[in-house]
């Protein structure tokens, strides 16, 4: 691989690929787009021009020794990791590799119930047994997470730390503790007491930090990173919040974990080769290199401060029916969560209304809009968002209602009931679970939802889930393969889908089968 000295270059991988693209070389190798030359302009002049394959003049993204390795080392230095690995196949693959690095097949793990569906898939592939930490719904307005009188910034349940500590103490055979933080609403639920208790028992702590890739850029503004809290391995989705191509992601291993487990670095590289494509994308890898360099720049810090100013501006400009929910000390201040509970809009009405006005948002639940501003989002976009919400408010038949009646309506209405049901499902007691067998049976299942509801059955009759039930976004499983679900809950899911919640189809099997 390339042994040219890129060690002093701020973006070694990006620069090496750019040098190759500018060299005028003749390509008789894959990919068939000839380094992007086969594409029409402007596509050919963009990142597609960095398309390449593993050559002597660049590097191997799965086993780097040249510019790609230098780029990973620069990422590790910036993020505070002992080792960082680039993934061009997304955080799902990085999560598979993280678990395979830390755990033997068949291991028992304790995990937050608010994990991404990728963990359920990884548990099936690695035959892991999952033990779920007890969850609870925080009191409204507690810990800066909500505004008076009631709405929480994040409706997701949080870990019940006292009960979780007891579970760690009494559960035998645990091999790891797994968190997901921050969540889709930007809230970090990573109790330090649990992390320390896990380390005291010799357990590695793993974290899906997909939404926290920007935190290292301004430690005085953002919550502490997972690595800074003492997490041993974590995955970040660079493409979610940074200027990187989708699905660019990173896997970090901490210094302390590598001291305790020197073989982990080798295992991580081997796990990446096991799960990632053998043709990783050079443009995506280069964008990871660029994103890290951008986070290190003075320009990035200036953009972050500007973004905070833009959010303050938006808070002042929104119509009365909408409110930017304040960020507490454990919330991402750049994650824009807007309450719409007193607006009178349904989820579908608000999503389609904004779309019709040219505003595309990340997610809407039954009471909130969730927006992910890019680090360089201009003030004009916030002005346009405010104008769109004002226009919708004026056009809506419920315009002019006072705030209190709106809140009361929300408290008594279907949106509040929907939120309560989702919280109840995530907080329910759950048995130890090995989802592998049910997951692979589900590939052949002929019973699906909602089709199964056309059959006769009692409301309390149970069926076994054989594929993940996870509204998307945010992709948090309500049921995992191997768990039982009643027809009553299946019907309730159908109601929620009719109200605007996107629930991908899933498979089931009858308990008699």
Residues of each region from the PLM?
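Short glycine-rich or small-residue beta-strand-to-loop segments that form or flank ligand, phosphate
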Residues: 58, 85-87, 177-180, 337, ...
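Charge-dense polyanion-binding interfaces
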Residues: 502-513
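A short linear hydrophobic-aromatic micro-motif
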Residues: 83-85, 236, 358-362
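Conserved C-terminal alpha-helix-loop-beta "cap" of PLP-dependent enzymes
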Residues: 319-483, 488, 492-502
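Conserved N-terminal alpha-helix of the aminotransferase class I/II PLP-enzyme fold
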Residues: 47-90, 114
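N-terminal "arm"/small-domain region of PLP-dependent enzymes with the aminotransferase-like
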Residues: 1-66, 472-474
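Conserved PLP-enzyme active-site core in the AAT-like
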Residues: 10-18, 22, 42, 81, ...
């Amino acid at each position: 691989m390339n042994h040219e000295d890129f060690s002093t270059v701020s973006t070694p991988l990006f620069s090496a690929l750019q040098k190759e693209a500018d060299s005028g070389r003749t390509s008789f190798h894959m990919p068939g787009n000839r380094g992007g030359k086969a594409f029409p302009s402007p596509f050919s002049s963009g990142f597609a021009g960095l398309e390449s394959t593993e050559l002597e003049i660049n590097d191997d993204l799965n086993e780097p020794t040249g510019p790609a390795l230098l780029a990973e080392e620069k990422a590790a230095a910036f993020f505070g990791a002992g080792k960082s690995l680039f993934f061009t196949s997304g955080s799902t693959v990085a999560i598979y590799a993280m678990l395979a690095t830390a755990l033997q097949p068949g291991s028992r793990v304790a995990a937050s119930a608010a994990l991404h569906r990728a963990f359920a898939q990884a548990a099936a592939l690695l035959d892991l047994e999952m033990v779920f930490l007890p969850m609870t719904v925080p009191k409204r307005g507690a810990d800066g997470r909500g505004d008076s009188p009631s709405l929480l910034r994040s409706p997701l349940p949080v870990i019940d730390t006292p009960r979780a500590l007891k579970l760690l103490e009494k559960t035998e055979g645990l091999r790891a503790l797994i968190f997901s933080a921050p969540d889709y609403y930007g809230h970090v639920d990573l109790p330090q007491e649990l992390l320390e208790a896990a380390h005291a028992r010799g357990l590695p702590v793993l974290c899906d930090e997909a939404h926290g890739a920007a935190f290292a850029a301004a430690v005085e503004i953002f919550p502490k990173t997972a690595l800074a809290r003492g997490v041993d391995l974590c995955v970040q989705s660079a493409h979610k919040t940074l200027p990187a191509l989708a699905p660019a992601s990173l896997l970090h291993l901490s210094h302390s974990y590598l001291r305790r487990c020197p073989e982990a670095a080798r295992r991580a590289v081997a796990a990446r080769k096991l799960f990632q494509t053998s043709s990783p994308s050079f443009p995506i890898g280069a964008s990871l290199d660029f994103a890290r360099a951008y986070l290190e720049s003075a320009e990035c810090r200036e953009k972050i401060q500007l973004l905070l100013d833009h959010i303050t501006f938006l808070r002042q400009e929104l119509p009365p029916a909408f409110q930017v929910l304040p960020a507490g000390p454990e919330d991402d201040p750049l994650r824009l969560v807007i309450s719409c509970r007193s607006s009178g809009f349904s989820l579908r009405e608000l999503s389609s209304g904004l779309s019709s006005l040219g505003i595309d948002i990340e997610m809407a639940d039954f009471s909130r809009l969730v927006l992910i501003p890019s680090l360089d989002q201009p003030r004009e976009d916030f002005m346009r968002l405010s104008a769109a919400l004002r226009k919708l408010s004026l056009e809506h038949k419920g315009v002019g209602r006072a705030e209190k009646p709106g809140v009361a309506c929300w408290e008594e209405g279907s949106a509040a009931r929907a939120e309560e049901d989702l919280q109840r499902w995530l907080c329910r007691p759950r048995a130890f679970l090995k989802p592998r067998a049910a997951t692979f049976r589900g590939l052949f299942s002929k019973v699906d939802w909602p089709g199964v509801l056309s059959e006769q059955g009692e409301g309390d009759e149970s069926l076994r889930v054989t594929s993940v039930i996870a509204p998307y976004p945010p992709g948090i499983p309500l049921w995992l393969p191997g768990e039982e679900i009643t027809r009553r809950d299946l019907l309730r899911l159908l109601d929620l889908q009719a109200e605007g919640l996107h629930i991908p189809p899933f498979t089931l099997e009858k308990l008699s089968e």
